[in-house]
């Protein structure tokens, strides 16, 4: 089970750099000796199985959960079958304990958030209406954000989108009890 105090979500509009930022944060976390997990929210149906495979057949037969296990990987698929999509906190409760859970997406979750933002997204930062965003990772850094959203640039820490070291330090400091 992952404690809520060790969860950060990377949020932002489509093509804002979220996935690349998560990759860099995971790499920097591992470099620092942290044990890290990730959770990714998908806006489309997810199926990692292949039609006709044994695990697919188990699921099609009605299994609630299907565990696929090998010497190098363990995958658990849970069928919702009409139940509500689990929240990030519900997902975190099912994961092994780690130093940090980095989520991609989950904009409506009540956890601490870093926003990835590019002015090419042509949308205002989510941070302008979301108090759980505690910092921004911006392509072009604070000068870019200051040109477009000066109040936000004054109110929140702003990092260059590629500055995984600085962003992770901010995350760790923000999540400290």
Label each PLM-derived region with a short phrase.
Residues 3-4, 62, 95-97, 129-130:
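Short loop/turn elements that form and flank the Walker-type P-loop nucleotide-binding site
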Residues 13, 41-42, 51, 70-71, ...:
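Fold-independent oxyanion-binding glycine-rich loops
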Residues 79-108:
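Phosphate-binding/switch loop-helix module in NTP-utilizing enzymes
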Residues 1-44, 148:
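Walker A (P-loop) phosphate-binding motif
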Residues 100-176:
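Phosphate/Mg2+-binding loops and adjacent switch elements
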Residues 3-5, 25-29, 91-95, 159, ...:
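P-loop NTP-binding site
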Residues 24-89:
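N-terminal phosphate/diphosphate-binding loop that engages ATP/GTP or pyrophosphate donors
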Residues 5, 16-20, 24, 53, ...:
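Conserved active-site and cofactor/substrate-binding residues in soluble primary-metabolism enzymes
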